[in-house]
A protein has these predicted regions:
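Cell-envelope/extracellular polymer assembly enzymes that use nucleotide-activated donors
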Residues: 6-8, 36
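Residue-level preference for short helical/loop micro-motifs built around acidic side chains
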Residues: 18-22, 46, 50, 74
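Acceptor/aglycone-binding surface of glycosyltransferases and processive sugar-polymer synthases
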Residues: 68-82, 87-90, 96-128
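Structural signature of the Rossmann-like NAD(P)-dependent dehydrogenase/reductase core
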Residues: 8, 41-44, 66
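Conserved donor nucleotide-binding strand/loop of the catalytic core
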Residues: 35, 49-82
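A conserved acidic beta->alpha catalytic loop
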Residues: 41-49, 95
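Active-site beta-to-alpha loop of glycosyltransferases that engages the nucleotide-sugar donor
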Residues: 11-25, 43
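Short, acidic, metal-binding catalytic loop of nucleotide-sugar glycosyltransferases
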Residues: 25-34
Length: 128
């Protein structure tokens, strides 16, 4: 029987070909639970897709989800509609620095928190 994902990581992309490889390498080498990465994209010609396919050709953790419309919000909605995991985390394609927060967020989920919203932009926000 196939084990269910504990975590789906949604990454909305739009021309992120310069940053996505580093971001994915960091996630793939850091996250410790059973997870999938859902790449939510607007259009088939987005250079991000080719870069991912060229650098991670046989990685079964990476799933491509085409946006039903266009734009960031619709990409997230498309991603949420495609999730199957217990927990969902939104991660930015150009954030190759804060990948360690993924495990911390998942730990908080396991502790019983239903919404975890880390942000480096919220006044008084901090890494836990």
């Amino acid at each position: 029987m196939k084990e269910k994902n504990q975590l789906d990581i949604l990454i909305p992309v739009f021309n992120e070909d310069e940053t996505i490889v580093k971001t994915l390498k960091n996630i793939l080498s850091t996250v410790s639970c059973n997870y999938k990465i859902l790449i939510c994209y607007d259009y088939d010609e987005d250079p991000t897709l080719k870069i991912i396919k060229d650098n991670f050709p046989y990685n079964l953790k990476i799933i491509f989800v085409k946006n039903f419309s266009y734009g960031f919000n619709n990409a997230l909605i498309s991603g949420f509609k495609s999730t199957t995991a217990e927990a969902v985390l939104i991660f930015m394609a150009d954030d190759h620095i804060n990948h360690d927060v993924i495990n911390l967020c998942y730990e908080k989920f396991i502790e019983g928190y239903q919404v975890i919203c880390p942000s480096r932009f919220i006044k008084g926000g901090k890494m836990i």
